[in-house]
A protein has these predicted regions:
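Cytochrome P450 core scaffold surrounding the K-helix E-X-X-R motif
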Residues: 16-23, 33
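Alpha-helical interface subdomain recognition
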Residues: 6, 25, 30, 34-192
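Flexible, small-/acidic-enriched active-site or ligand-binding loops
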Residues: 1-11, 17
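Glycine-rich beta-alpha junction loops
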Residues: 11-12, 59
Length: 192
């Protein structure tokens, strides 16, 4: 599980400060003070980049599911007409596009801010949290559009769904992303 702990006014001997050697740019022989703080900041920036990357992967999965669903809805004939001519299929595709485009814009903004050197912890958390859940919703609708065939390996949407589900967990679950956003916006922790 991912969680946060903080210690105030708790002295830590230099030899007990945990900072990876690669974060210090040296052999890892101790570290502390400003050097450890900079290493922590650098690590968090990398984590923000990873979270934005998870958002990008999720957008790619969602877009692939949209594309597969549009293709299937145009080609599949049901009751003598294309599946895409049914109102609910069109509504699902509209919802899928809304989620995909929203996730794309949130993720691009988080990445752009990071590239400008602007603090983007909230934006990367929004992007990762929203994009991974959006990909899950989109791929679920893709399976529904494909019907029972959506669960078979004959169509790629079953794999997209599995991949989307997996992305909601690493580098902070959706719930953790929401806690980070809440803390960034309100300036207070949800737990002590």
């Amino acid at each position: 599980p991912t969680s946060e702990m903080s210690f105030d006014d708790c002295p830590v001997p230099e030899q007990n400060i945990i900072v990876a050697p690669w974060m210090l740019g040296g052999s890892g022989e101790g570290g502390g003070g400003d050097k450890a703080a900079q290493a922590y900041f650098d690590f968090m920036q990398r984590l923000n980049g990873i979270r934005a990357g998870m958002g990008l992967i999720s957008v790619g999965i969602a877009q692939a599911a949209v594309d597969a669903s549009i293709k299937y809805a145009k080609e599949r004939i049901q009751f003598g007409k294309p599946l895409g001519s049914f109102q609910m299929v069109q509504e699902m595709i509209a919802d899928m596009l809304t989620d995909t485009w929203s996730a794309r814009l949130l993720t691009y903004r988080a990445i752009w801010l990071g590239g400008q050197g602007v603090k983007n912890r909230m934006e990367t958390s929004l992007a990762k949290g929203f994009a991974t859940e959006a990909a899950l919703r989109v791929t679920s609708k893709a399976i529904q559009i494909h019907g029972a065939m959506g669960l078979s390996e004959e169509y790629p949407v079953e794999r997209y769904f599995r991949d989307a589900r997996m992305l909601t967990m690493p580098d902070g679950t959706t719930q953790i992303m929401k806690l980070i956003v809440g803390r960034e916006v309100l300036g207070m922790r949800a737990y002590t």
